[in-house]
């Protein structure tokens, strides 16, 4: 029996009996794909090799994972799996006809792989030919397919099923199935009162009580009332239901769920959630204009195209001949359909040396220790993406001159231009409703989602996300007593407000607005756009100014009072990410983007924003929590518990709710993270979203004397004062030892915010608290084990230093809303700016630094 050439086409000729005998030992390992099995026959699990690649793709006949030539041996050594289906697409030059031209087009029966055609090759001159064969390791015996007569039936069936399997990235019916809602019988004939009610886009409150969550807008009279145990499991005082019983007005829409695609509507009469086919008209009656929010099929609104043509041209540097860039670090990424937000963020992330070292530098170790299914491992997919972008393997210049010189009928070996992040996107977004869709997303939200995953999946001794982390000192002052409270929280992004009132071209803006309105009334073409010019210094000043705290509860007065909050940097990050807060909502509920030009500096110094702590003469607010309030109607399944009325940061709650999370889950996230901000609460949501009570109402049990005292800490405690495990986990995730977290929570009556203050005020305990703390870790905390083992005792992992920075990258957005438009990334590499526009990577001639959305700065060494 002759041995085939390694990875070659030298398969041995053998009789039918020999083939059957050869495959007998491997028959138990060969499986036929079933419904629900993911078959990866177009992409390697460790690289971006495909059947188009020179070495083709090897698909395991047991796990259905695909591997390129470079990685197939690794899978064989790890699993012992021997039988693979080798897939290869060949590019053949067409044979010219008698007249000298190519033969007429005909259906190619030799194409059976679901692959895209190479756009660099003309279909008139070249054609494709697909090849499939079985390869048996370790001797690399090759068996050409089809071979029905000689192969066992199981092998033939398995091979055919694998070749005909659908892409794993298409949603399967069981995963995408949702209960189909029926149109309400009241929708078509709903009577709406002409009472002049207009609903603002925020600041809602039940008209019969003080509840600010789980609010429902009655579509007949515009009443805003709280719900009680509706279809989503949310709770309240039931005023919406009482209103229906009094008036008979049947339909209500839940505030916070209104999007361009619809809203959650409930029918009190039909006692179930329903569809309202006329929801846009019904909401418009109260000033909520959804029709203007509708998104076109191509993902762009009509009003994205005409008024902002100049924005698209400037950001993409249209009209300028840009030189394509190739090689390591200049690899483009395919747009999978509104995935430009992901492409832009990942290009910026892998331009940072710490991420390059963590994933690409550790690539052999990450791949060798990857799980049996590497497509479901975060670090493996990060390393794969980083290598794809930085290796230069998928960014090679076209070889047209060599193409012409090729001999007739010789096989052409095309170069792969760019990578398709399909596997990466499928994994990183699988548990996120928005990111798993094909809708456009906010790049800032995706950045935070990515950082959260990096935090939860440590790699090596250093966490690369540490370079973004910094501490924010928040000084809250009671305006009446003048007493203050200092707290610290972790953040990753500096959110910079747009100081529109500081525009330097106000006269031009006023004149433009008048011309625009005149043109609109006369149905003429709009005038040339005039963009507001905002000084960066004004935005920085707006960031540093005090802001009002709504519903502030003063512990000095033990009552609600006016309060103001000021933020400063308790530490400066190694890499500063600055988000320009361009997106907002108008009074008509239409999401708007502030079309501004900000003179972002190449060199930035924010040293003056360094936090100073408690100042001489300042008096701190007492450590007293708000009182417990017993609900009006405790007759529900939680009737034995009390609901604590707390000072929950509603702005953080709404920010999370706008991402698509249930409102009650957002309230719990903000509550359990001690009002430390939306970013910290977002991490809590990701960590708890699989729990069955994720969307249940926030109910804090109070036991024994705690209830009678009238005062309880954040997260009321049991008789033994044992801290809640989720609070312990939050502190551990910030880099502290478990024993120190428990000690701090017990010392502060389980008040998370005060516990962090306590830790910072007891540095001597951090030094004493060392390795022995690792021995008391519960098995439930295995997800934090690596982080805890690597954490040092100095507190949250920060890389403090001078507050002087240099700009090295920015992400720009084109369009009027984060729900539509397009993202582009500019990065400074090797002394020059480069534009990354999906697959197109070119040297930038005029980087539009004044129109960016997210900016990346690196610290200037002192």
UniProtKB/Swiss-Prot annotation:
Residues annotated to bind Zn(2+): 206, 209, 226, 239
InterPro entries: Papain-like_cys_pep_sf, Peptidase_C19_UCH, Ub_carboxyl-term_hydrolase, UBA, UBA-like_sf, Ubiquitinyl_hydrolase, UBP13_Znf-UBP_var, USP_CS
Stretches annotated zinc finger (UBP-type): 182-290
Domain USP, residue spans: 331-860
EC numbers on record: 3.4.19.12
Enzyme class: hydrolase
UniProt keywords, alphabetically: Autophagy, Hydrolase, Metal-binding, Protease, Repeat, Thiol protease, Ubl conjugation pathway, Zinc, Zinc-finger
CDD domains the UniProt entry points to: Peptidase_C19B, UBA1_UBP13, UBA2_UBP5
Swiss-Prot/TrEMBL catalytic activity: Thiol-dependent hydrolysis of ester, thioester, amide, peptide and isopeptide bonds formed by the C-terminal Gly of ubiquitin (a 76-residue protein attached to proteins as an intracellular targeting signal)
Residues in UBA domain copies: 647-688, 722-762
Active site: 340, 822
GO function term, MF aspect, one: cysteine-type endopeptidase activity
The organism's place on the tree of life at top rank: Eukaryota
Single GO cellular component term: cytosol
Any GO BP: autophagy
Activity regulation annotation text: Specifically inhibited by spautin-1 (specific and potent autophagy inhibitor-1), a derivative of MBCQ that binds to USP13 and inhibits deubiquitinase activity.
UniProt note: domains: The UBP-type zinc finger has lost its ability to bind ubiquitin and USP13 is not activated by unanchored ubiquitin. The UBA domains mediate binding to ubiquitin.
Family (UniProt): Belongs to the peptidase C19 family.
Record's function text: Deubiquitinase that mediates deubiquitination of target proteins and is involved in various processes such as autophagy and endoplasmic reticulum-associated degradation (ERAD).
Protein name as annotated: Ubiquitin carboxyl-terminal hydrolase 13
Originating species: Gallus gallus (Chicken)
């Amino acid at each position: 029996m002759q041995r085939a050439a390694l990875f070659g086409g030298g398969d041995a000729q053998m009789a039918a009996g020999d083939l059957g005998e050869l495959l007998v030992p491997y028959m138990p390992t060969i499986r036929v794909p079933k419904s629900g099995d993911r078959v990866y026959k177009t992409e390697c699990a460790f690289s971006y090799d495909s059947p188009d690649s020179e070495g083709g793709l090897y698909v395991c006949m047991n796990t259905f994972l695909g591997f390129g030539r470079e990685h197939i041996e690794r899978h064989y050594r790890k699993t012992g799996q021997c039988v693979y289906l080798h897939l290869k697409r060949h590019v053949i030059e067409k044979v010219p006809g008698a007249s000298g031209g190519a033969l007429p087009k005909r259906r190619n029966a030799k194409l059976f792989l679901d692959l895209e055609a190479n756009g660099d090759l003309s279909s008139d001159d070249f054609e494709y030919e697909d090849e499939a064969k079985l390869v048996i390791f370790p001797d690399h015996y090759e068996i050409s397919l089809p071979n029905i007569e000689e192969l066992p039936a199981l092998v033939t069936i398995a091979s055919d099923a694998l070749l005909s399997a659908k892409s794993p990235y298409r949603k399967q019916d069981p995963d995408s199935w949702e209960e189909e809602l029926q149109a309400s019988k009241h929708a078509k004939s709903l009577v709406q009162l002409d009472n002049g009610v207009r609903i603002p886009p925020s600041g809602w409150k039940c008209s019969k009580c003080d509840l600010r969550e789980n609010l429902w807008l009655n579509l007949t009279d515009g009443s805003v009332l709280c719900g009680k145990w509706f279809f989503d499991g949310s709770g309240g005082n039931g005023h919406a239901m009482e209103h229906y019983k009094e008036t008979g007005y049947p339909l209500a829409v839940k505030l916070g769920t209104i999007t361009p695609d619809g809203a959650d509507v409930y029918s009190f009469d039909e006692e179930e959630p329903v569809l309202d086919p006329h929801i846009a008209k019904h909401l418009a009656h109260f000033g909520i204009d959804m029709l203007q929010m509708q998104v076109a099929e191509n993902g762009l609104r009509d009003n994205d195209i005409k008024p902002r043509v100049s924005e698209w041209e400037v950001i993409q540097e249209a009209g300028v001949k840009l030189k394509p860039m190739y090689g390591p670090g200049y690899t483009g990424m395919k747009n999978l359909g509104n995935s430009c937000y992901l492409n832009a963020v990942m290009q910026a992330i892998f331009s940072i040396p710490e991420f390059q070292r963590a994933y690409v530098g550790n690539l052999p170790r990450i791949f060798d220790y990857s799980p049996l299914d590497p497509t479901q491992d975060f670090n493996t997919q990060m390393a794969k993406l980083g290598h794809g972008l930085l290796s230069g393997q998928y960014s090679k210049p076209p070889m047209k001159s060599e193409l012409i010189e090729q001999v007739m009928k010789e096989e052409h070996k095309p170069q792969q231009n760019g990578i398709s992040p399909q596997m990466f996107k499928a994994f990183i977004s699988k548990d996120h409703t928005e990111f798993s869709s094909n809708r456009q997303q906010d790049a800032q939200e995706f950045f935070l989602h990515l950082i959260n995953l990096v935090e939860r999946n440590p790699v090596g001794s250093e966490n690369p996300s540490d370079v973004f982390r910094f501490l924010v000192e928040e000084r809250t002052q009671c305006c009446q007593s003048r007493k203050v409270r200092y707290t610290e929280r972790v953040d990753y992004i500096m959110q910079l407000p747009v100081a529109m009132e500081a525009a330097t071209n106000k006269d031009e803006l006023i004149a433009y607005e008048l011309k625009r309105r005149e043109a609109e009334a006369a149905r003429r073409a709009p005038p040339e756009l005039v963009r507001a010019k905002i000084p960066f210094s004004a935005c920085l000043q707006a960031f540093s100014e005090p802001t009002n705290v709504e519903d502030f509860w003063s512990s000095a007065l033990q009552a609600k009072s006016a309060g103001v909050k000021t933020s400063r940097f308790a530490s400066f990050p190694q890499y500063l990410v600055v988000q320009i807060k361009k997106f907002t909502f108008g009074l008509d509920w239409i999401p708007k983007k502030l079309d501004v030009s900000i003179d972002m500096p190449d060199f930035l110094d924010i040293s003056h924003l360094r936090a100073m702590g408690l100042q001489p003469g300042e008096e701190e607010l007492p450590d007293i929590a708000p009182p417990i309030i017993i609900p009006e109607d405790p007759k529900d399944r939680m009737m034995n518990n009390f609901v604590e009325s707390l000072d929950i940061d509603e702005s953080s709650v709404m920010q999370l709710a706008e991402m698509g999370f249930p409102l009650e889950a957002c309230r719990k996230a903000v509550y359990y993270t001690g009002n430390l901000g939306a970013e910290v609460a977002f991490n809590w949501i990701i960590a708890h979203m699989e729990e069955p009570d994720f969307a249940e109402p926030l109910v804090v049990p109070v036991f024994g004397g705690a209830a009678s005292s009238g005062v309880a800490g954040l997260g009321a405690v049991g008789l033994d004062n044992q801290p809640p495990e989720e609070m312990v986990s939050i502190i551990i995730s910030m880099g502290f030892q478990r024993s120190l977290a428990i000690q701090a929570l017990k010392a502060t009556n389980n008040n998370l915010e005060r516990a962090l203050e306590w830790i910072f005020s007891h540095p001597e305990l951090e030094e004493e608290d060392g390795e022995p703390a690792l021995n008391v870790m519960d098995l439930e905390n295995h997800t934090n084990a690596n982080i805890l083992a690597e954490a040092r005792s100095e507190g949250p992992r920060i890389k403090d230093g001078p507050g002087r920075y240099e700009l090295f990258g920015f992400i720009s957005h084109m369009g009027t809303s984060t729900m539509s438009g397009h993202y582009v990334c500019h990065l400074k590499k090797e002394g020059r700016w480069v534009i990354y526009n999906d697959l197109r990577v070119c040297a930038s001639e005029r980087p539009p630094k004044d129109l960016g959305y997210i900016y990346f700065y690196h610290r200037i060494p002192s």
